[in-house]
């Protein structure tokens, strides 16, 4: 069996540079190189390996620049033969695994430098270093696989956000993420001044102004601004019902109808009104509801004096005086005072009919139309 001393030499862990390669390193990188070479040398000495104090070690110890091997193959002219063997007696012999760990940590220093400066010295500067990694792979125990560690380390995310700590492999993704913190919105609409962080979002928004509707239904000719809207609309023609209730198996064409149905299974209404029997999930909701029976209206409009039982109703009412319409349709730009009015309006664009009759299955876009229809059955 090959002895441990024979399997690893100083040249196995040495990193050689040509003159051209050395010029590419800055001051900090050269300092790191000196530290790495000295630590490799000391690690081998500490386990009793026969080491020749090479020219590079002597120069590093004296504070001079290390040797730079001329030629394409740095290993063809070895400086080890220029100096005699230097032994350090009395050094405690570490275990094989401890030695390998120390060498692994040494290589990690190099890898750390490579990651920080966004280039790989092992490929761009000196391909011979790959042989050093391979020589260690044979003698490393399974939990110290240097090549495996190297692969996982070098693909580590190099771009880290200073705000939240999230890291990215690609600079493009990192820059795009940073905008979430800085809220930079460089893409501004020339028509209304609204700004967006991404150009694609601006392009989508501008369709509102130019009236572009590129997605046309082949069955009825109706056009839509977004492809997703066309896909939803086409369910009217195909009869597709992709939303299935896991509780009862009932299927639905529209996601809104499906969500409304699911709530009927999951919502527990434990608070019941003693006046009308209506149940509520929260006690606060029951308390607000009770005002309809008592006639209590504690919230009064300061402009017209009209009173309301809930603050939300008062806020909505005041928009009549201020003219505020915060809910705007992305399709046509029409604005509404209430969100419910916007949702009802959007159905005219999508063709959605979320209100379905339990008796005959006929669907309607407006709840009021469903109520009128149900009178036929009663």
Swiss-Prot record:
Residue ranges of every copy of the KRAB domain listed in the record: 8-79
Subcellular localization(s) per the UniProt record: Nucleus
Zinc fingers (C2H2-type) by residue: 159-181, 187-209, 215-237, 243-265, 271-293, 299-321, 327-349, 355-377
Cellular compartments per GO CC: nucleus
Gene Ontology BP annotations: regulation of transcription by RNA polymerase II
A Pfam family per the record: zf-C2H2
Main location: nucleus
Paired cysteines (S-S): none
Classification via InterPro entries: KRAB, KRAB_dom_sf, Znf_C2H2-type, Znf_C2H2_sf, Znf_C2H2_type
Keywords in alphabetical order: DNA-binding, Metal-binding, Nucleus, Repeat, Transcription, Transcription regulation, Zinc, Zinc-finger
Molecular function terms from GO: DNA-binding transcription factor activity, RNA polymerase II-specific; RNA polymerase II transcription regulatory region sequence-specific DNA binding; sequence-specific double-stranded DNA binding; zinc ion binding
Family assignment from sequence similarity: Belongs to the krueppel C2H2-type zinc-finger protein family.
Its biological purpose: May be involved in transcriptional regulation.
Stated name of the protein: Zinc finger protein 684
Protein encoded by which gene: ZNF684
């Amino acid at each position: 069996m090959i002895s441990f001393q024979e399997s690893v030499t100083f040249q196995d862990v040495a990193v050689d540079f040509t003159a051209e390669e050395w010029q590419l390193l800055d001051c900090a990188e050269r300092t790191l190189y000196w530290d790495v070479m000295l630590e490799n040398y000391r690690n081998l000495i500490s386990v009793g390996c026969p080491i020749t104090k090479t020219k590079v070690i002597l120069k590093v110890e004296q504070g001079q620049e290390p040797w730079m091997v001329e030629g394409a193959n740095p290993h063809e002219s070895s400086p080890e033969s220029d100096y005699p063997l230097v032994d350090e007696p009395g050094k405690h012999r570490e275990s094989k695994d401890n030695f390998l760990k120390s060498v692994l940590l040494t290589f990690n220093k190099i890898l750390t430098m490579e990651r920080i400066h966004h280039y790989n010295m092992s490929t761009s500067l000196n391909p011979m270093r790959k042989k050093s990694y391979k020589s260690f792979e044979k003698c490393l125990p399974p939990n110290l696989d240097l090549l495996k560690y190297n692969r996982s380390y070098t693909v580590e995310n190099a771009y880290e956000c200073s705000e939240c700590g999230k890291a990215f492999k690609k600079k493009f993704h990192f820059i795009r993420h940073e905008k979430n913190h800085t809220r930079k919105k460089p893409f501004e609409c020339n028509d209304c001044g609204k700004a967006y962080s991404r150009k694609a979002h601006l392009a989508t928004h501008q369709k509102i102004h130019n009236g572009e509707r590129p997605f046309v239904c082949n069955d009825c000719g109706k056009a839509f601004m977004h492809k997703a809207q066309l896909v939803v609309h086409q369910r009217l023609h195909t009869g597709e019902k992709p939303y299935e209730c896991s509780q009862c198996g009932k299927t639905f064409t529209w996601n809104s109808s499906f969500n409304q149905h699911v709530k009927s299974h999951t919502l527990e209404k434990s608070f019941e009104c003693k006046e009308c029997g209506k149940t509520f999930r929260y006690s606060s909701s029951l308390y607000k509801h009770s005002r309809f029976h008592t006639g209590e209206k504690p919230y009064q409009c300061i402009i017209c004096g009209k009173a309301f039982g809930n603050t939300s109703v008062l806020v909505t009412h005041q928009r009549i005086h201020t003219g505020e319409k915060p809910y705007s349709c992305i399709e046509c730009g029409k604005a509404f005072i209430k969100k419910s009015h916007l949702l009802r309006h959007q159905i005219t664009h999508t063709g959605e009919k979320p209100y379905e009759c339990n008796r005959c299955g006929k669907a309607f876009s407006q709840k009021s139309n469903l109520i009128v229809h149900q009178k036929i059955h009663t």
